[in-house]
Amino acid sequence: MAADKAGEQGAEKHEGSANCSGISDQEKELSRSALQAFTAGNYEACLQHLGELKEINKDDYKVILNAAVAEFYKSDKTTTDLLKQTLNQLRNEVHSAVDEMDSLDDVENSMLYYNQAVILYYLRQHMEAISVGEKLYQFIEPFEEKFAHAVCFLLVDLYLLTFQTEKALHLLVVLEKMILQGNSNNKNGKNNETNSNANNKELFAQKGDGGVNVEAAKSKIHQYKVRAYIQMKSLKACKREIKSVMNTSGNSAPSLFLKSNFEYLRGNYRKAVKLLNSSNIAEYPGFMKTGECVRCMFWNNLGCIHFAMGKHNLGLFYFKKALHENDNACAQLPSENSDPGKKFSGRPMCTLLTNKRYELLYNCGIQLLHIGRPLAAFEYLVEAVQVYHSNPRLWLRLAECCIAANKGTSEQETKGLPSKKGIVQSIVGQGYHRKIVLASQSVQNLLYNDGESSAIPVASMEFAAICLRNALLLLPEDQLETKQENGSKASSQTVNTDSSGESSDVCSNKNHEGDKFIPAPPSSPLRRQEVENLRCSVLACIAYVALALGDNLMALNHAEKLLQQPRLSGSLKFLGHLYAAEALISLDRISDAITHLNPENVTDVSLGVSSNEQEQGSDKGENEPMESAGKQIPQCYPSSVTSARTMMLFNLGSAYCLRSEYDKARKCLHQAASMIHPKEIPPEAILLAVYLELQNGNTQLALQIIKRNQLLPSIRMMSDLRKKPLFQTMHQPMQPIQMPAFAAAQRK
């Protein structure tokens, strides 16, 4: 653990300063004895020597620092709050802040800052820890070798946790040179520093531990590089480093997890599962020593792989197994202290990173949403959003749960086709007075609040509006200029962690503008193009929800904003025109609505491919084909430009009806019907045909359309009706007539 070497280095620093200050031999001997006792794990003797030092020199705060670290280790690293409080007091006593470190004179306080950075790391305050670590890195040259390595390893870990991969890779190159140079100096007899490996038995679990042998340090560097390349999806570079990891670490659980993650990115899902199953997680140290529940990570990674394969039910099973393992691990930890001053005490400091419950809840919610169980997904995601409330993507997923829960889920809709059931609600009366009651098509817009506040987390359209408003507010207000690439709707994300912690805020001072992102924990951060795609998705959902709630002005406003987006996919552009037209019709602006319903507005209905996926495919560098992803998500309706233009024509006909332009409406209806198969005609179009025939006085033809539940060509049917009685009672069964396709009828 990083604090381990901090304690050793603190004592060594005190000894070095004693030599410079000309203090007595007694103080030197006590300092040396304290260091030896600490290294040997004899913390009682170490504290005794430090107490004697404090009696001699009461003004040296380094003695107090070393005593605090020794007390921390004596308690088996369970007094985190006390150590944090002592460090804060010492910082106030020396009147020094991290921002004030501007010269080498402040290097003497480096041990204090480093220990604070380690505590911030375990408290998941990553940005604060990075701020301290970067200040220390500026003065790394005068540091001793072991301490310099510790600072670099800690910073690398923090950069990876905050997705600053370029900084992490740069620092790894520097660290590699430092280790090679130090090894060369040792071989030449230039380094006479005493090196103890007594505390290196927990190498992999220790964060930022620089006092390790060269081979172990090289292996650790290779593992960090693999994690960085996996984040960058640079598969060629990752493949080279994976070989180095396997050569240096063998078939250890961390190396096999990393290789499995690599195969997962390549699309070799079966191989990824095989690698996970071959890892002997039973031999890996327990979470009490490392802070990492390997069993939890094992099941979580299996869930992610099966999610990518399209096996969502199996993926959900594995995520629930991971959640069960996580809860079992947390149950073994002492309950949280009610005293705010001892919130993090009573448990080893490394176990502060053990609980991954909310990441797993997020994964379960996404899986359930894909399965088609929005209400169950809502329950999981509502709990996750209490922690990850700054994630705009998560708020969108919550809104999608609400929309799906309040939307019809007929069998035809799930297959991507419109429903044609429910045109006739009932039949009333008898004989001459027999009437057909048509079902209302606007039932889905009748929402009830039941007097409850819309802020209460319930899967309602009112709560969906709040979620979407939050998502829009969390996205950057200013449009970011980007390269001219084809955008796409943001896809659902799951977390695939091998030894990861919780994501946090990230630095914005990146070297390349294209790499700017906003955090979206627990999933990966949103890159520039993903932000634009997500904004388009949110605007489309807001317009839909506003229409459902009857807020037509809000719907029109957001639909127009959607159409103004520079990187708009074809499918969302189609929806934008439809939502804008519906809002305008409700506002009695039919002429403006007709402009939006022009079929020529639809030229593409694809969801698009994100740049990240394109880069991943181009960087594959392999001749072997990727595995099939299993059961794919069905294409949303409409699945083609023809279907989309047909939908536009049906709606355009409805708009013409509102202006009593029935001839134009009939032309739109017949033109649309000739473009698609009769079974794909939506029920709204059939009702429109019934309305037009009633307006034209063709009652019998309207009845025939209702009975057959399909459109009928007017000319053919009128000629048939002249040869048959004009009226048939509704209770008599009618023999089905095989009707020709619309194209054939029109040719005749």
Swiss-Prot record:
Regions of compositional bias (Polar residues) in chain numbering: 487-509, 605-615
Chief place of localization: cytoplasm
Keyword Nucleus: yes
Keywords: Cytoplasm, Nucleus, RNA-mediated gene silencing, Transcription, Transcription regulation, Translation regulation
Coiled-coil residue spans: none
Protein's cellular compartments: Cytoplasm; Nucleus
Region of interest: Disordered: 1-25, 483-524, 605-634
InterPro entries linked to this entry: CNOT10, TPR-like_helical_dom_sf, TPR_rpt
GO cellular component labels: CCR4-NOT complex; cytoplasm; nucleus
SMART domains: TPR
Alphabetical GO biological process terms: mRNA catabolic process; negative regulation of translation; regulatory ncRNA-mediated gene silencing
Biased composition (Basic and acidic residues): 1-16
Domain of life of the native organism: Eukaryota
UniProt keyword Nucleus, yes or no: yes
SUPFAM superfamilies: TPR-like
Disulphide bonds in the chain: none
Family per similarity comment: Belongs to the CNOT10 family.
Main function: Component of the CCR4-NOT complex which is one of the major cellular mRNA deadenylases and is linked to various cellular processes including bulk mRNA degradation, miRNA-mediated repression, translational repression during translational initiation and general transcription regulation. Additional complex functions may be a consequence of its influence on mRNA expression. Is not required for association of CNOT7 to the CCR4-NOT complex.
Known partners and oligomeric status: Component of the CCR4-NOT complex. cnot10 and cnot11 form a subcomplex docked to the cnot1 scaffold.
Name of this protein: CCR4-NOT transcription complex subunit 10-B
